[in-house]
Amino acid sequence: MNNKEFNMEQFKKLAAVVSEDELDEMLDENVTGAASSIPCAKVVVKVTTVVVAATTGFDWCPTGACTTSCRF
């Protein structure tokens, strides 16, 4: 596998996989919209002991972080 290929099965073993609704709920508790101190370009969610970092380039925008600056 070269560096450009993405293997979802290997990713699932390494990362926490949560539903969009769960992400929205977690972010709604931590993000207050445009006035948030958390930059939506780097949303970090701690799930148990696994930290999942979503940075620019992701193709989803949780409703809790859908301010103008979060629409990539």
UniProtKB/Swiss-Prot annotation:
Record-listed cross-link Beta-methyllanthionine (Thr-Cys), residues: 55-61, 63-66, 67-70
Free-text function comment from the UniProt entry: Lanthionine-containing peptide antibiotic (lantibiotic) that is probably active on Gram-positive bacteria, since its analog [Del1]Flvbeta.e shows antibacterial activity against Gram-positive bacteria. This activity is not synergistically enhanced by [Del2]Flvalpha.a, an analog of Flvalpha.a, which is encoded by the same operon than Flvbeta.e. The bactericidal activity of lantibiotics is based on depolarization of energized bacterial cytoplasmic membranes, initiated by the formation of aqueous transmembrane pores.
GO molecular function, one term: signaling receptor binding
Keyword Lyase: no
Gene Ontology biological-process annotations: defense response to bacterium; killing of cells of another organism
GO CC list: extracellular region
Propeptide positions: 1-34
Compartmental location: Secreted
Record PTM text: Contains LL-lanthionine and DL-beta-methyllanthionine, when coepressed in E.coli with the flavecin synthetase FlvM2.
Residues joined by cross-link Lanthionine (Ser-Cys): 36-40
PTM sites of type 2,3-didehydrobutyrine: 48-49
Keyword annotations from UniProtKB, A to Z: Antibiotic, Antimicrobial, Bacteriocin, Lantibiotic, Secreted, Thioether bond
Cross-referenced NCBIfam families: lant_II_LchA2
Protein's name in the database: Lantibiotic Flvbeta.e
